[in-house]
Amino acid sequence: VLEAFTASGDPARWVILPGPATAVMARYARELGESLGGREIEPQSVWCSWYSYYEGISQEALEREIPQVAELGFKTLQIDDGWEVAVGDWEAGESFGDGMEAAATRIREAGMQPGLWVAPFIALPGSRAVRDYPEMFVHNADGGLAVAGSNWGGDYYALDTTHPPAHTYVRKLIAKSVHRWGFSYLKLDFINAAAIPGYRHRQIDREEAYRTGLRLVRDTAGDETFLLGSGALIMPSIGLLDAVRVG
């Protein structure tokens, strides 16, 4: 192990491992897991609504699918994007008239783990989060909100995970999803937005800003909640997420 430094000048380590490529990578994976506290979780069989309904998932569609998905032997049924009012307004939309707690209960009563899609580190311009609390998002040098990407027909902004109001926002979203509604599996999407370049409340490494956000999620959700990262930074997620979508 050699001493090294990151781009910001902070100390780091280089690891030199001799041997065939596959053996080296296997050992490197073990070393990373041990260093960062990697989580060892049994693989899950998950049915995700996205690939059948995209944003068209609804309470009625869910009720049709639940018995079929259970019969096929899936352990988890995860509701994907489309359930919410808007990205940044994390309440049940019109298509889930009975609410998300009722949806989680129906999935659980069918013998499966209820899962939910959320994008905790981004919000759309028209959302209440952006309108009411613009200070909790990453900014540009000119003081405007930094664009993290484009989807849903327009740009979206990235949460500043170093800012105390953003901490409150994330904790409320995760606590509601897990402890009030009863979802014990979360698909966390677009989470690389936490690491975009820009001006933050505290100027820390972008990787640390990302891990700060994930720590908020993990600490609030608890160790028993399965966290899947989508659009995730793979190595910085070790020790905080249970799995990462790579396809």
Summary of predicted features, one role per range:
Residues 73-247:
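Aromatic- and carboxylate-enriched substrate-binding clefts and catalytic-loop regions
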Residues 1-72, 76:
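Carbohydrate-recognition beta-sandwich/jelly-roll modules
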